[in-house]
């Protein structure tokens, strides 16, 4: 399904007619700069995402073609008018292809800069995102590309697509005989298939099946390094890693192959420090250690031809350019320079040939290309009213709160903001306890809570974010007073890493970014689980527990974009509350301002999700029909209820507008 949306959809660059005619609502460059800093778009957006003159998010899938832009807010509204359901993934295959070109270009520059004679090859590990649209977009990019598999199912997908590229295939993960035989079949078909030995028991099966198929195996070895990265994924590297061979086992593998007359089959050295490496120093240390394995294996007579440094190339989810778990303190060029220099230096020092360098950079290729867009279905916000004095005979705790409120408005008072806040908190605590004991009425409790909110609001206005001593109080008050936004999505399905490992993703409204973010909000999903909430948000150069929000109409809140969800999230998403896959569209943007949208995934229906848990929709419909027939409802109402039930079975799992 393809829709040409070039008619009626303005692009956000080259908007010579539509946007230029709306200068009365266009924001100043100063306002734009402030919004970019608030959400750090300039850093995590990586030139793919920006704020246009209308205060809308714009997307430039290929920064080398800056005139090819689309207003994302306008695109979503146009799609909604055409029947697009939310939540939905908006995928930009051109970003995938630009990421691939950028990584290849960085390594080309590094090789030229350091006089490195070996080749470079990017291998895409499909575990990061196995969707056909992703794999085929990368394969059809025109760039050299290999594929990596970590299971039998992935290897079958890779082999089927390999005919389009005739390229390198790397086989990682634990392997049984069927997996190994599939890989050897690929080698026999003419592909370069590297079977990476992860444990010693695999080598006997490899040699046995290679003989059966009369094929020379192409082998790799994964060395377990002492070096280890830091962060959420550090356990995938280091001496305690689940994968790889220790130094003793590497020697044992070499001798086993020598005795079998297959030492020439060992052609690839592989290591992996961990995913999303935040610190370039950790990467440099790991590459230097692995380079020693390359040198020592050559001394043992092993002609290693490929040096696979694995994954680890991170992306800056926060936009803080730091060593935090969800950021990186380096760019593509520095990453490539460190790898090429370390390997080349070891080769020059020992008079060895420069091997082909392979990286398995999945996250860095796919993260940016997908945005989850959803609608806010409800807002709960604190409204501040002018407080009235309590009755003269009101209990002491109420009188105390009122006295604090009056003192806050007296000129020249010497008490601190913190002291006012603490006094009001203690009074409110006493009132809550007294309410449970029957001392205070419901009306008195409500009055105290409303007055406390007004006091918090008053204190907040007088705090200075630049004053370090004020920051803890500001954070506390922002959490207490933030708007609660109920968003039509499942955190567990669409952003499982935000729940499982507390990963941060950029989240912000798609419009209204021409206004100062005066409000704060927390985002809650529609699952029946208190964990279904986003706990951390980008806020300038730091991370906050509430999200900056421009002023908005609570009856018509803006759509929200959840950015950089292209790596792992679609694959790891689970079925909590039986919320399924969202709809997905591929968006192509062209220099003339035209946009082409293709529906790539219709999303799961309720029936789809029920079948996952062995609940047959037809059986459920029959059971429901039997119940309805036994009621004393009239025939017309019975038929109406049956039709509604059946329509619901084959409808979207998310909330839909009537």
Curated annotation (Swiss-Prot):
Keyword rRNA processing on this protein? no
Q: In which pathway does it act?
A: Amine and polyamine biosynthesis; agmatine biosynthesis; agmatine from L-arginine: step 1/1
PTM annotation (N6-(pyridoxal phosphate)lysine): residues: 127
Which keywords, in A-to-Z order, does the entry hold?
Decarboxylase, Lyase, Magnesium, Metal-binding, Periplasm, Polyamine biosynthesis, Putrescine biosynthesis, Pyridoxal phosphate, Spermidine biosynthesis
This entry's Gene Ontology molecular function terms read: arginine decarboxylase activity; identical protein binding; magnesium ion binding; pyridoxal phosphate binding
What's the chief localization of this chain? periplasm
Per UniProt, what is one Pfam family of this protein?
Arg_decarbox_C
SS bonds (residue pairs): none
So which cofactors does this thing need?
pyridoxal 5'-phosphate; Mg(2+)
Subcellular location per UniProt equals:
Periplasm
What does the record give as the function of this protein?
Catalyzes the biosynthesis of agmatine from arginine.
Something else known: ADC can be found in two forms: biodegradative and biosynthetic. The biodegradative form may play a role in regulating pH by consuming proteins.
Descriptive protein name:
Biosynthetic arginine decarboxylase
Report the source organism.
Escherichia coli (strain K12)
Which gene name belongs to this protein?
Answer: speA
């Amino acid at each position: 399904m393809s829709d040409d949306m070039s008619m009626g959809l303005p692009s956000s660059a080259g908007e010579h007619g539509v946007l230029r005619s709306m200068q009365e609502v266009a924001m100043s460059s100063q306002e734009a700069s402030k919004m970019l800093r608030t959400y750090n778009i300039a850093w995590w957006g990586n030139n793919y995402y920006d704020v246009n003159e209308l205060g809308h998010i714009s997307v430039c899938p290929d920064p080398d073609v800056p005139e090819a832009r689309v207003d994302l807010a306008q695109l979503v509204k146009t799609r909604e008018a055409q029947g697009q359901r939310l939540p939905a993934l908006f995928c930009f295959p051109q970003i995938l292809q630009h990421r691939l070109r950028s990584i290849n270009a960085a390594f080309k520059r590094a090789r030229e800069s350091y006089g490195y004679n070996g080749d470079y090859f990017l291998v895409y590990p499909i575990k990061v995102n196995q969707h056909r649209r992703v794999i085929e977009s990368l394969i059809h990019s025109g760039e050299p590309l290999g594929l990596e598999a970590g299971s039998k199912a992935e290897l079958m997908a890779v082999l089927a697509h390999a005919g389009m590229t005739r390229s390198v295939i790397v086989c990682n993960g634990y392997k049984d005989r069927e997996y190994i035989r599939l890989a050897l079949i690929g080698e026999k078909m003419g592909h370069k298939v590297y079977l990476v030995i992860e444990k010693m028991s695999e080598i006997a099966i490899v040699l046995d099946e290679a003989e059966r198929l009369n094929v020379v195996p192409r082998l790799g070895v994964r060395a377990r390094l002492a070096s280890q990265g830091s962060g959420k994924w550090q356990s995938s590297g280091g001496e305690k890693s689940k994968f790889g061979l220790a130094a003793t086992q590497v020697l044992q593998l070499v001798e086993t192959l020598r005795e079998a007359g297959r030492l020439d089959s060992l052609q690839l050295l592989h290591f992996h420090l961990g995913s999303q490496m935040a610190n370039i120093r950790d990467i440099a240390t790991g590459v230097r250690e692995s380079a020693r394995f390359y040198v020592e294996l050559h001394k043992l007579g092993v002609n290693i031809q490929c040096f696979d440094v694995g994954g680890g190339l991170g992306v800056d989810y926060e936009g803080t350019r730091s060593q935090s778990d969800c950021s990186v303190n380096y760019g593509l060029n520095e990453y490539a320079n460190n790898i090429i220099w370390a390997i080349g230096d070891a080769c020059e020092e020992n008079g060895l040939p420069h091997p082909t360098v392979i990286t398995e950079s999945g996250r860095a290729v796919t993260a940016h290309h997908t945005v989850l867009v959803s609608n806010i279905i409800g807002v709960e916000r604190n409204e501040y009213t002018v407080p009235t004095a309590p009755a003269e005979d009101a209990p002491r705790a109420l009188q105390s709160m009122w006295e604090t409120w009056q003192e806050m408005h007296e000129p020249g008072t010497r008490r601190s903001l913190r002291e006012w806040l603490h006094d009001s908190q203690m009074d409110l605590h006493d009132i809550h306890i007294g309410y449970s004991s029957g001392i205070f009425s419901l009306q008195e409790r409500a009055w105290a809570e409303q007055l406390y909110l007004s006091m918090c609001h008053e204190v907040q206005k007088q705090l200075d974010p630049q004053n370090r001593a004020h920051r803890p109080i500001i954070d506390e008050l922002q959490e207490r007073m933030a708007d609660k936004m109920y968003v039509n999505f499942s955190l567990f399905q669409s952003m499982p890493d935000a729940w499982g490992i507390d990963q941060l993703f950029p989240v912000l409204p798609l419009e209204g970014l021409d206004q100062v973010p005066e409000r704060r909000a927390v985002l809650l999903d529609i699952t029946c689980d208190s964990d279904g909430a986003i706990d951390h948000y980008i806020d300038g150069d730091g991370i906050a527990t509430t999200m900056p929000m421009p002023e908005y109409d609570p009856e018509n809140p803006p759509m929200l974009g959840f950015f950089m969800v292209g790596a792992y999230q679609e694959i790891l998403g689970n079925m909590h509350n039986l919320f399924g896959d969202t709809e997905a569209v591929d968006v192509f943007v062209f220099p003339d301002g035209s946009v082409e949208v293709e529906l790539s995934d219709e999303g799961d229906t309720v029936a789809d999700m029920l079948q996952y848990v062995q609940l047959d929709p037809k059986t459920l419909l029959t059971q429901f029909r039997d119940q309805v027939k036994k009621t004393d409802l009239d025939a017309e109402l019975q038929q109406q209820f049956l039709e509604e039930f059946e329509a619901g079975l084959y409808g979207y799992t998310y909330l839909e507008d009537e």
